[in-house]
């Protein structure tokens, strides 16, 4: 299993950073409705939206943009590990946010197309 270690390590690192930003912006990991709202916003945030958040002088906006960027890395890590037959799992924040992202994606929310 050592060949899969970097996926688990990446998940741990992402979990820590997701948790820190979530706490800073007041995310309630135990509120499925609010998690889905956050996931919907993350999935529908265009590259321009992301840059606006990341460049914002408002701390809450900047942290939200960082959380959205981390969610993209989280999804990429899960997708890449799944392609080789390894399921990546993080901690409670990862699971809550990942579940909400998957539910919103299943409900039809899609990331904007590149260049859109």
What would you call each of these model-derived segments?
Residues 9-14, 25, 100-103:
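Exposed, low-complexity/repetitive linear segments and helix-based recognition motifs
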Residues 17-78:
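Amphipathic alpha-helical interaction modules
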Residues 9, 27-30, 92:
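Short coil/turn linker and secondary-structure boundary residues
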Residues 69-116:
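Amphipathic alpha-helical binding modules
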Residues 1-20:
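Intrinsically disordered, low-complexity linker/tail regions enriched in Pro/Ser/Thr
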């Amino acid at each position: 299993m050592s060949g899969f270690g970097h996926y688990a390590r990446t998940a741990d690192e992402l979990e820590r950073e997701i948790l820190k930003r979530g706490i800073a912006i007041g995310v309630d990991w135990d509120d499925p409705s609010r998690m889905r709202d956050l996931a919907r916003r993350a999935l529908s945030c265009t590259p321009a939206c992301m840059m606006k958040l990341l460049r914002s002088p408002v701390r809450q906006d900047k942290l939200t943009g960082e959380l959205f960027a981390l969610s993209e890395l989280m999804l990429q890590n899960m997708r890449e590990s799944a392609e080789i037959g390894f399921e990546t799992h993080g901690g409670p924040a990862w699971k809550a946010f990942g579940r909400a992202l998957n539910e919103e994606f299943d409900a039809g929310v899609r990331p904007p197309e590149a260049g859109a």
